[in-house]
């Protein structure tokens, strides 16, 4: 497909929005899912101040803004802001007219029905798209890894899901959701850095801590052993320069932060860790397909980017599973964007073209058409 009629693929994550054209191998635009509003009206006289900023511009002016994320735990909570993000995506990032392109959107598994209806309504009524489709994020990640059967552990900024998929269809009864993801880990890192004497409190400072997390954190293979190493030597210490030039040193926080994925009690949560959640998800599936799921456990999303996470998952799931079971954790290098890549693949398949919801179908049936056509 050439660019002029190419479908648009928009993966709206809680933390980052990934957007581009179907058939491309990577998103053209990746920007934070943030809408910022000035804290004080009219401070910047003559700056042509806008009443709201989106994405990177909001990020760069964060000192004078209050930042809000319209997507929480993978689900849209503020539709006005969400519309701003979509508007920004089409007109500023991709520079396309949405009324000329089919749009593929993504959604969290177990997304409330009203949410997908609202997405559908906004696409057809506000942006006048000729056609659209809503696909489940984890299923797209599996397609991107070249499989149609497997279990996806998808962990982003706002939510973590384990989604077993058989022959291309998600098994809804076995999907498990964990409200513990990147943003919680950033908040936890803010907290444990405060214990070290560094204070990070504002929404702007949270973004600095997110950067520290992304650059320096890793998952320990054996947490207790790593704690002992950190206590007895400075070999694990790293330094980080803050925007104001101050240099901070971070030690065991580097692996204590993502350890919360395996031990949510660190965050005061009673849920199971990602390893147990994955295992529980597999156990909710038919006994005959479990073997295929254990052997095709695919990691996806930005929160699976920590060095060491795949080895640790392998170790933990091996300990839970039957001893003879073959376990394979697949961690594709591009997994940060695998939902988007899967969407790009799906939207450019010739067999997919009859799956789009057309404007005509929407006009006849209304928003509820989405439940009949997207599953």
UniProtKB/Swiss-Prot annotation:
The keyword Kinase does not apply. The modification Methionine (R)-sulfoxide is found at residues 44, 47. InterPro entries: Actin, Actin/actin-like_CS, Actin_CS, ATPase_NBD. The modification N-acetylmethionine is found at residue 1. One of its GO terms (cellular component) is cytoskeleton. One of its GO terms (molecular function) is ATP binding. Oxidation of Met-44 and Met-47 by MICALs (mical1, mical2 or mical3) to form methionine sulfoxide promotes actin filament depolymerization. Mical1 and mical2 produce the (R)-S-oxide form. The (R)-S-oxide form is reverted by msrb1 and msrb2, which promote actin repolymerization. Keywords: Acetylation, ATP-binding, Cytoplasm, Cytoskeleton, Hydrolase, Methylation, Nucleotide-binding, Nucleus, Oxidation. Pfam families: Actin (PF00022). SUPFAM superfamilies: Actin-like ATPase domain. Its main location: cytoplasm. It is found in: Cytoplasm, Cytoskeleton; Nucleus. Its EC number is 3.6.4.-. It catalyses: ATP + H2O = ADP + phosphate + H(+). The modification N-acetylaspartate is found at residue 2. Actin is a highly conserved protein that polymerizes to produce filaments that form cross-linked networks in the cytoplasm of cells. Actin exists in both monomeric (G-actin) and polymeric (F-actin) forms, both forms playing key functions, such as cell motility and contraction. In addition to their role in the cytoplasmic cytoskeleton, G- and F-actin also localize in the nucleus, and regulate gene transcription and motility and repair of damaged DNA. Polymerization of globular actin (G-actin) leads to a structural filament (F-actin) in the form of a two-stranded helix. Each actin can bind to 4 others. Belongs to the actin family. In vertebrates 3 main groups of actin isoforms, alpha, beta and gamma have been identified. The alpha actins are found in muscle tissues and are a major constituent of the contractile apparatus. The beta and gamma actins coexist in most cell types as components of the cytoskeleton and as mediators of internal cell motility. This is Actin, cytoplasmic 1. It comes from Xenopus tropicalis. The gene is actb.
């Amino acid at each position: 497909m050439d660019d002029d009629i190419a479908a648009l693929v928009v993966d709206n994550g809680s933390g980052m929005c990934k957007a581009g054209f179907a058939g491309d191998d990577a998103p053209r635009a990746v920007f934070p899912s943030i809408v910022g509003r000035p804290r004080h009206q009219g401070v910047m006289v003559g700056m042509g101040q806008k009443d709201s900023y989106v994405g990177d511009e909001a990020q760069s002016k964060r000192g004078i803004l209050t930042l809000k994320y319209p997507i929480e735990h993978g689900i849209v909570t503020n539709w006005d802001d969400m519309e701003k993000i979509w508007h920004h995506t089409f007109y500023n990032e991709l520079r396309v007219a949405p009324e000329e392109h089919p749009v593929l959107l993504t959604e969290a598994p177990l997304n409330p029905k009203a949410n997908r209806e609202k997405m559908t309504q906004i696409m057809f009524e506000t942006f006048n798209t000729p056609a659209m489709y809503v696909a489940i994020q984890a299923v797209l990640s599996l397609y991107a890894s070249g499989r149609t059967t497997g279990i996806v552990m998808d962990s982003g900024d706002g939510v973590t899901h384990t989604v077993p998929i058989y022959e291309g269809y998600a098994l809804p009864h076995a999907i498990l959701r964990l409200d513990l993801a990147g943003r919680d880990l950033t908040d936890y890192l803010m907290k444990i850095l405060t214990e070290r004497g560094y204070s990070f409190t504002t929404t702007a400072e949270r973004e600095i801590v997110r950067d520290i997390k992304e650059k320096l954190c890793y998952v320990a293979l054996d947490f207790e052993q790593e704690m002992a190493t950190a206590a007895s030597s400075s070999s694990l210490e790293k330094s980080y320069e803050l925007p104001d030039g101050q240099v901070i040193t971070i030690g065991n926080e580097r692996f204590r932060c993502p350890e919360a994925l395996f031990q949510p009690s660190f965050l005061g949560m009673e849920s199971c860790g990602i390893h147990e959640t994955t295992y529980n998800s597999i156990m909710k599936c038919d006994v005959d397909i479990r073997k295929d799921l254990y052997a095709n456990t695919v990691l996806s999303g930005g929160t699976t980017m920590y060095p060491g996470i795949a080895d640790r998952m392998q170790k933990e799931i091996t300990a839970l599973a039957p001893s003879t079971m073959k376990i394979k954790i697949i961690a594709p290098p591009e997994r940060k964007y695998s939902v988007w890549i899967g969407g790009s693949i799906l939207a450019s398949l010739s067999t997919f073209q009859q799956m789009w919801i057309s404007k005509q179908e929407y006009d006849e049936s209304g928003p509820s058409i989405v439940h009949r056509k997207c599953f």
